[in-house]
From Swiss-Prot:
This is Small ribosomal subunit protein mS46. Residues 45-59, 168-200 have a biased composition (Low complexity). Belongs to the mitochondrion-specific ribosomal protein mS46 family. One of its GO terms (cellular component) is mitochondrion. The keyword Transcription regulation does not apply. Component of the mitochondrial ribosome (mitoribosome), a dedicated translation machinery responsible for the synthesis of mitochondrial genome-encoded proteins, including at least some of the essential transmembrane subunits of the mitochondrial respiratory chain. The mitoribosomes are attached to the mitochondrial inner membrane and translation products are cotranslationally integrated into the membrane. It is found in: Mitochondrion. Component of the mitochondrial small ribosomal subunit (mt-SSU). Mature N.crassa 74S mitochondrial ribosomes consist of a small (37S) and a large (54S) subunit. The 37S small subunit contains a 16S ribosomal RNA (16S mt-rRNA) and 32 different proteins. The 54S large subunit contains a 23S rRNA (23S mt-rRNA) and 42 different proteins. Keywords: Mitochondrion. Its main location: mitochondrion.
Length: 414
């Protein structure tokens, strides 16, 4: 049972007499106020006042009834504990400097004499004068040892001060928690002493502000942080929403349109250039014109056409020609065919010179008639026309009548 209950019970006046009656005749424990009052009035003998000035006892208060009930319970517990323990423990030898509370003599409380309110101690029987005595628990210093130590419980050094049950160890600072650990000598408060109580918030360090709701700026959180827009970005956004006035600067010129015009047979310079470029593109494979290098040109196809097929290649610009050279390893584009061949191509494709078809009067001149039609159309290239004429001559030679052989006599004479 809690030691505070025992202290408050033994320290009250007028309770020791009830303890004596409880030792002589135990009664069942009951917390009913009416029953306790009836039993006290019926069983308590009438005592004559010891002094003329002693007043008659008043009615029993509620606190006294609770105290009497607690004393009765203590008496029952004491009897059961004594029967269970070994009686020889009372005669055991205690360590040096130790005291046993059971062998202490009762001493009256200072300033209080024997009177009507005084009662006898727990052991029964008073002093020589018969005055009751009460044990003052506060005067029993050094009788309770520190729990959890290696010493025997209840034994301390003589004259040592009473230490509370959950007192801090030596060297602990004042104001420590109830269950705080001992601090090293000369050291300040430890982490346990600085820990806030249970349920309380820890104090923020100086200068630390809340992230939300405070006056300080919010801290950036990695990828979620967006930098404020610059002046250029703001101007761009305003232009998208509200529009802006810009000056029109034309970028198209006649030179930039060169190569995209129609090949019209006119006396204008632009028409002649477009016609010449169209003819050259057809001779180079018929690729469309493009002034951007690498858009319509395939370096592999150009190399195969130029090296293996021995055909001309047309480049839309000088930059495209250089790009093809850099794209193909160990491939060098020559300056072109011989000067005679270049002049022939220039006269035929650019200047528009061609061989005039000849008029054939007789339909029997088949070869000349075919050459006439080949010169008036672009369906046959010069190489294709040569192949066609060669085959035609073979067929015509096979259809000619053979010459008659010479007579045998003439051969003999010869």
């Amino acid at each position: 049972m809690n030691r505070q209950v025992v202290t408050s019970t033994l320290g009250r006046r007028g309770v020791a007499s009830t303890i004596l009656n409880a030792q002589q005749q135990q009664r069942p424990f009951s917390s009913t106020t009416t029953r306790c009052a009836a039993e006290d009035d019926s069983k308590k003998p009438a005592a004559a006042p010891s002094t003329p000035r002693a007043a008659a006892p008043g009615p029993i208060s509620a606190s006294r009834q609770k105290s009497e009930a607690a004393v009765g319970k203590l008496t029952q517990l004491r009897g059961s504990f004594t029967s269970l323990t070994n009686d020889n423990s009372f005669h055991k030898t205690l360590p040096a400097g130790a005291r046993d509370a059971r062998r202490l003599a009762a001493a009256p409380i200072a300033g209080k004499g024997a009177g009507a309110g005084a009662v006898a101690p727990l052991g029964g029987g008073g002093g020589a004068s018969g005055a009751p005595k009460v044990i003052n628990v506060r005067s029993l210093k050094g009788t309770l040892g520190s729990r959890g130590s290696n010493n025997i419980p209840g034994a301390v050094a003589p004259g040592a001060a009473l230490r509370p049950r959950f007192a801090a160890g030596p060297g602990a600072a004042a104001g420590r928690p109830r269950f705080g650990a001992a601090a090293s000598p000369g050291a300040g408060p430890t982490g346990a002493a600085r820990r806030p109580p249970f349920g309380a918030r820890r104090a923020r360090p100086a200068g630390d502000k809340k992230r939300s709701g405070g006056s300080g700026d919010k801290r950036p959180r990695g990828d979620d942080y967006d930098a404020p827009p610059t002046e250029e970005e703001k101007a761009f956004l305003r232009g998208l929403e509200q529009g802006k006035v810009t000056e029109y600067v034309p970028k198209l010129t006649p030179d930039t349109l060169l190569g995209y015009g129609p090949p019209v047979a006119t006396d204008a310079a632009l028409g002649k250039v477009e016609s010449a470029m169209r003819t050259m593109r057809i001779l180079g494979g018929g690729l469309p014109f493009n002034d951007q290098s690498g858009v319509t040109s395939d370096p592999t196809a150009i190399k195969h056409r130029y090296v293996h097929e021995k055909k001309p290649v047309f480049f839309s610009s000088v930059e495209e020609k250089e790009w093809v050279r850099e794209s193909l390893d160990k491939f060098a584009v020559s300056e072109g065919p011989e000067k005679k061949t270049k002049q022939k191509i220039l006269e035929t494709s650019v200047l528009g010179k061609y061989e005039e078809p000849k008029y054939v009067e007789s339909l029997t001149e088949t070869v000349k008639m075919v050459e006439k039609y080949q010169g008036g159309t672009f369906s046959y290239a010069p190489s294709d026309a040569d192949k066609f004429n060669k085959k035609l001559n073979q067929l015509l030679a096979a259809g000619l009548p053979r010459a008659a052989p010479a007579p045998a006599q003439a051969q003999k004479k010869a």
